[in-house]
C-alpha cells in the first residue's frame, strides 16, 4: 500500500470523530451554561496547552518515533472525548480541552514529517504538495459527513457528539500500529536535542521560514470563526439546519484544496499564494461581520473557508521543502509553537472584549469584522515583504 494512501486512510479516520463534534460543539458548551466569552477563554486554554506541548512532542517524534507520537495523540484524543462525555461545567470542559490539546500536539509536525519522508523513500518527493492538498480534500468531505451525523446525534442528546471520538481514536491508533511503522521515520536519525538545535539553527538562517511563521501568527485571527459560526447560524436555521450550513462551508474548504493540487508553481515557491489565501479569509470575515440575513453571511463564510482550505497545504509544502529529514517533526513543532501564538492571543482578546456582552449574532458579527480587518492588514503587509525564492 502506497504511503500516500496510508496517510489518507489514517487522516480520514483520525478526523472523523472530531468532525462529528463541529456542528454542535458550541451549542453543547452553551448547554453546560458557558457564555460566548467563556467559550473563547476555553479555546485560549486549549491552544495554550497545545502550543506548550508542541516542542517536547515534536522532539520525541524525531528522537523516538513518529508512529509512536501519532499513537500517543490518538490516546489523548480518546481520553479527551471520554472527559467531555461527563463534563458538567467550565472546569470539567477545561480538563477535556487540555487532554485534546496535548493529543493535537502529538499529531502536529509528526503527520507531515511522516508522509514527507515516506514519499521520499518511494521516490515521490515531487508529489508532496499534491498529497497534502488531496488530504485536505478528503478531510473536507470527512468533516462534511461527520458534521451532518453530529447534527443528527445532537437532536437526541447533544452530549453524545463526543461518543464517536472515543471509538475512532483507537481505530486510528490501530491503523498507525499496523501500517505506519518504519517508512515515515527520519532518513538520518538524530537525538531529541540534536533535532532541536538543528531546527533553531535553520529558523535563524531562513528568512522564508521566519516569514511563514509570522503569517501563521496573523492567521490565528481565523479562530474567531471556529466556535462562533454555529451560535450565529443556529437561530436562523435550527440545530439540524447547521448540518447543511456546515456542508456548504466545508465544501468550499475542500474545493480550495483541489485548486492547490492543480497549481503548477515549483514546490517551495508558494509565498504569494499563501498571502492570497489569508486575504480571502479576511475578506470573508469582514463581509460576514457586515452582513445580515442568511445568504449574504453564508456566502461570506464560504469564501472565508475557501481561503483556509488553501492555506494549510500551501504552508505544509512551503515548509517541508526547506526542512531536512532528521528534524522535520521537531521543526514542525517549533513552527507551531511560534506560529500558533495567534491562536492563543486571539481568543483571550475576544474574551476580554465580549465577556460582558450578550450572546447574540451582533456580538459575533462585531468579532468577525475586527478579526477580518486584522487578517487583511497582516496579509497585505506580509505580501509586500514575501520571500521571492
What are these regions (language model features)?
Residues 1, 180-214:
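Juxtamembrane intracellular "pre-TM" segments in multi-pass secondary transporters
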Residues 1-52, 205-249, 339:
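Helix-loop boundary and gating motifs at the non-cytosolic
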Residues 52-65, 154, 256-269, 354:
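Helix-to-loop junctions at the C-terminal end of transmembrane segments
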Residues 75-89, 279-292:
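C-terminal ends and interior cores of transmembrane alpha-helices
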Residues 98-140:
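Cytoplasmic helix-loop-helix junction between adjacent transmembrane helices
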Residues 152-167, 241-243, 352-375:
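A membrane-interface helix-boundary motif in multi-pass transporters
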Residues 165-191, 383-389:
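Helix-loop junctions on the cytosolic side of multi-pass membrane transporters
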Residues 271-312:
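C-terminal transmembrane helical hairpin of 12-TM major facilitator-type secondary transporters
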Amino acid at each position: 500500500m502506497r504511503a500516500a494512501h496510508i496517510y489518507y486512510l489514517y487522516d480520514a479516520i483520525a478526523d472523523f470523530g472530531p468532525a462529528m463534534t463541529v456542528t454542535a460543539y458550541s451549542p453543547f458548551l452553551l448547554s453546560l451554561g458557558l457564555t460566548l466569552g467563556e467559550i473563547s477563554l476555553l479555546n485560549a486554554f486549549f491552544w495554550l496547552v497545545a502550543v506548550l506541548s508542541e516542542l517536547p512532542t515534536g522532539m520525541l517524534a524525531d528522537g523516538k518515533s513518529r508512529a509512536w507520537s501519532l499513537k500517543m495523540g490518538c490516546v489523548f484524543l480518546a481520553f479527551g472525548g471520554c472527559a467531555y462525555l461527563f463534563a458538567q461545567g467550565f472546569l470539567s470542559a477545561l480538563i477535556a480541552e487540555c487532554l485534546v490539546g496535548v493529543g493535537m500536539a502529538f499529531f502536529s509536525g509528526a503527520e507531515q514529517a511522516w508522509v514527507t519522508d515516506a514519499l521520499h523513500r518511494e521516490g515521490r518527493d515531487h508529489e508532496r504538495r499534491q498529497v497534502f492538498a488531496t488530504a485536505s480534500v478528503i478531510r473536507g468531505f470527512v468533516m462534511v459527513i461527520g458534521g451532518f451525523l453530529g447534527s443528527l446525534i445532537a437532536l437526541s442528546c447533544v452530549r453524545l457528539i463526543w461518543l464517536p471520538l472515543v471509538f475512532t481514536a483507537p481505530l486510528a491508533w490501530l491503523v498507525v500500529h499496523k501500517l505506519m511503522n518504519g517508512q515515515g521515520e527520519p532518513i538520518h536519525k538524530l537525538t531529541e536535542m540534536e533535532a532541536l538545535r538543528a531546527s533553531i539553527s535553520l529558523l535563524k538562517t531562513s528568512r522564508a521560514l521566519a516569514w511563514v511563521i509570522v503569517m501563521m501568527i496573523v492567521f490565528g485571527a481565523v479562530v474567531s470563526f471556529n466556535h462562533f459560526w454555529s451560535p450565529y447560524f443556529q437561530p436562523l436555521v435550527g440545530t439540524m439546519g447547521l448540518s447543511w450550513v456546515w456542508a456548504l462551508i466545508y465544501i468550499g474548504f475542500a474545493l480550495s484544496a483541489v485548486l492547490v493540487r492543480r497549481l503548477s508553481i515549483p514546490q517551495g515557491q508558494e509565498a504569494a499564494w499563501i498571502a492570497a489565501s489569508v486575504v480571502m479569509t479576511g475578506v470573508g470575515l469582514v463581509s460576514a461581520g457586515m452582513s445580515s440575513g442568511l445568504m449574504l453571511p453564508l456566502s461570506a463564510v464560504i469564501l472565508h473557508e475557501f481561503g483556509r482550505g488553501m492555506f494549510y497545504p500551501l504552508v505544509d509544502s512551503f515548509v517541508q521543502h526547506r526542512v531536512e529529514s532528521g528534524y522535520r517533526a521537531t521543526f514542525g513543532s517549533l513552527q507551531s509553537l511560534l506560529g500558533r501564538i495567534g491562536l492563543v492571543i486571539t481568543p483571550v482578546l475576544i474574551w476580554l472584549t465580549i465577556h460582558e456582552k450578550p450572546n447574540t449574532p451582533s456580538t459575533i458579527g462585531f468579532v468577525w469584522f475586527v478579526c477580518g480587518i486584522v487578517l487583511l492588514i497582516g496579509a497585505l503587509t506580509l505580501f509586500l515583504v514575501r520571500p521571492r525564492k
